[in-house]
């Protein structure tokens, strides 16, 4: 018998079978026959013959192993290889290299597991249709260690083949040399044989070694048992259905997408996914499936919100950006699911065992979906937190989730925030650089009221929606943003300044994409703040320059001080002198054009004539509403017309304050004017009335009372002029000079008016004080009237006495009797009547003095109890010598206690 060639394929294959199984040639005859049949079959990988696809897999594998440099080197070498064209089968070489490189660490374990090769392959491959097996590149191939079965009763392979011989063949199957190139068995015979072998081998494999998986699987079910084991309890009376892990995996992948599986369905009552009660599962698999199904619930929650809000047009651009961000995250999630689905489909299509490390199990899904679950939980929390929000409020809700210590979660939310905030920043840059507000759905924190007219543009047309201010924008920044756009619109619409914005502001690059927005968020305190500050300062400076140079805002403010606050002393005094004959008349007899003529005369006769014509033409006379008994002094007022841009600072409310302050100052000035006339009367009539010694007591009382009134009015005028007007004006002027925007000027001006209004006793808290002060003013007018009557009576009496003496001297010169008895009696009677009227005059003066002092004392008591320190100090000045303190116990207690508190402090 010829010795077979030791290098022939038959001998090598037989030696390989002996080496793997560790048996003699006689014992491996049946396995050798099967091996020959397998080699002669049509097994081929089903991977697509794509050279570049394999190259990409190699690069990904290198990157996964953190060998980026090797991946780059491989890419360069592959490029050179492709360009040279020396090799013809590049795909085959790359595919070989890829398979050779896979999992070299598992080689040691494979040596001991070769014995199970045929035990695994026989039941699957002994049928008519050959399987095309291509192992996934991401999952390593592994065989179970079945070394323990060699110590059991016979080998699995021999028992399987003997059963085949007994059940399927009439005799032993001869070993045929199935070498490449030789003819195969007849198709009919081979097909029929394999159709009988398949189920018998499967049953033999599963029935003979039920415990062989236990030590090697370590809790992971074998892929063969998952795919081929069928429930034997389907006909049980309990109706329970044994579910394999493979079926659970398939259901879970559907649940991940929100689709009910065969065994896992959504419970509408409990709002969660639950495993069917009839499914026969151990507690571990059931709990794992429920944990995995949570991803489906999270997916449904996010998908439902995104789909519903995407169709809501009123949700606005910010909301649509949020929905787009959610869809983008779901897209990444779907990409993972597609990979898992392809892996599962590959296992089903191949029909071969991929090994424990290659198959999809619930525990592997639990590990692989750990990070996606965190992302979905974060997105679901965002969805809950953003319910009912839109615009800047929605951006604030997203921004709140960036304040976390988890870098993974923080990066996710920051990415979403960059998308969500992009419309807000687009609104913002359009507003600060163009002054345009295109906020159809009211998402921006700047609101516009189209019904407001131009004259109220600055005050009422543009406001802040505080609820829409994103939390990453401070209130100071939002106020500046409002002022920038408002300044641009004010210049265009009110000042009629059509200067392009680019000449006012150095326009920088805005947030043109979410990437720009993301970059901007990384430096909110510097880059973003710098843009806002630059636009704010440049726009505000340009606006103030226009108001000061073109519209003379500061000159108009000084004109208010000179004319309405009586700062132009010579003009006011001369105007009073000219108006006195007119204003003493009843108010109903006055005509405005007459008073306007007098005003123009006073302007031409004083330094007011040197003011700008623009200012003088705005100065006018105004008559207040007339009440019964009013004189011209009660209804006369100066007015200053404002319009255009300056009306934004000098609003109607401000002009109303000016009018009230002017009336108060005008009345106080009139009191000073009256007391001056009283003092003139004293000085002029003192010499004339020396010949009437009986009238000296009246003159003395008038002089004392007038002196008290002069002291009071002088102190009040000093307080009003210096402590109120001058100090407040100096503070206003300093603030106006330092103002950075128009709002600062308006605020300073309003604060100035509020200060002088309250300190001039014109606010609601000082009505009692003002009434007392008006009562003092009324007593001054009463003194003037009483003194005029007394002087008139005294001068008439003096005139009659002089006439009597003159007549007497004239008669004596003519040689007649100077006076007859009847004439002398009549003269004496008239003198007695005059002398009898003097006590009445003195009594009237005493009553007037008493009433005046009582009013002043009450006024001082009110001053000491005022919360304004300047008014408290005014009480010291008015009663510096404690004249009224000695007369009024309440004043004495109040002043004493206040003095003790001051000294103690």
UniProtKB/Swiss-Prot annotation:
This is Gamma-tubulin complex component 3. GO terms for cellular component: centriole; centrosome; cytoplasm; polar microtubule. Belongs to the TUBGCP family. Component of the gamma-tubulin ring complex (gTuRC) which mediates microtubule nucleation. The gTuRC regulates the minus-end nucleation of alpha-beta tubulin heterodimers that grow into microtubule protafilaments, a critical step in centrosome duplication and spindle formation. It is found in: Cytoplasm, Cytoskeleton, Microtubule organizing center, Centrosome. Keywords: Acetylation, Cytoplasm, Cytoskeleton, Microtubule, Phosphoprotein. The keyword Cytoplasm applies. The gene is Tubgcp3. Residues 174-193, 206-239 are annotated as: Disordered. The modification Phosphoserine is found at residue 113. Residues 206-228 have a biased composition (Polar residues). It comes from Mus musculus (Mouse). It comes from the Eukaryota. GO terms for biological process: microtubule nucleation. GO terms for molecular function: gamma-tubulin binding. Component of the gamma-tubulin ring complex (gTuRC) consisting of TUBGCP2, TUBGCP3, TUBGCP4, TUBGCP5 and TUBGCP6 and gamma-tubulin TUBG1 or TUBG2. TUBGCP2, TUBGCP3, TUBGCP4, TUBGCP5 and TUBGCP6 assemble in a 5:5:2:1:1 stoichiometry; each is associated with a gamma-tubulin, thereby arranging 14 gamma-tubulins in a helical manner. Gamma-tubulin at the first position is blocked by TUBGCP3 at the last position, allowing 13 protafilaments to grow into a microtubule.
